[in-house]
Amino acid sequence: MISDKIKLTAKDILEKEFKTGMRGYQQEEVDKFLDMIIKDYEAFHKEFDQLKQQNARLKRELEEQKVAATQVPQQPVQTPVAQPVYNNTNTDILKRLSNLEKAVFGSKLYE
């Protein structure tokens, strides 16, 4: 990411010593060093701009999500209505029906 593009640290800049020539510092060495500083600043500036844009985009998306969440109608949660529990199974019902038939019709069914 950004650390791959940056060649200098604050320590490098602070500790940089230029060799002096007959009339002072060597112009080419100073120019090369300043070129490296300029490239680093350009990389920092570019990365900073990208991060600002990304931050703004993410803030917009967050606001859109908040607005969308407030616009969704809150539907009440429907709990399932408890059905009456019958302990009778089909076989129990058939047995009861058979007993009723015997009581009503008596032995006529079995003659």
Curated annotation (Swiss-Prot):
GO cellular component, one term: cytoplasm
Main location class: cytoplasm
Superkingdom, natural source: Bacteria
Disulphide bond pairs: none
GO biological process: cell division; regulation of cell shape
Pfam families xrefs: DivIVA
Residues passing through the membrane, by range: none
Recorded coiled-coil stretches: 38-72
Compartment(s) of residence: Cytoplasm
Keywords: Cell cycle, Cell division, Cell shape, Coiled coil, Cytoplasm
InterPro entries in alphabetical order: Cell_cycle_GpsB, DivIVA_domain, DivIVA_fam
Function: Divisome component that associates with the complex late in its assembly, after the Z-ring is formed, and is dependent on DivIC and PBP2B for its recruitment to the divisome. Together with EzrA, is a key component of the system that regulates PBP1 localization during cell cycle progression. Its main role could be the removal of PBP1 from the cell pole after pole maturation is completed. Also contributes to the recruitment of PBP1 to the division complex. Not essential for septum formation.
Stated family: Belongs to the GpsB family.
Self-association state and partner proteins as the record states: Forms polymers through the coiled coil domains. Interacts with PBP1, MreC and EzrA.
Name of the protein described by the UniProt record: Cell cycle protein GpsB
Provenance organism: Bacillus mycoides (strain KBAB4) (Bacillus weihenstephanensis)
Gene that encodes it: gpsB
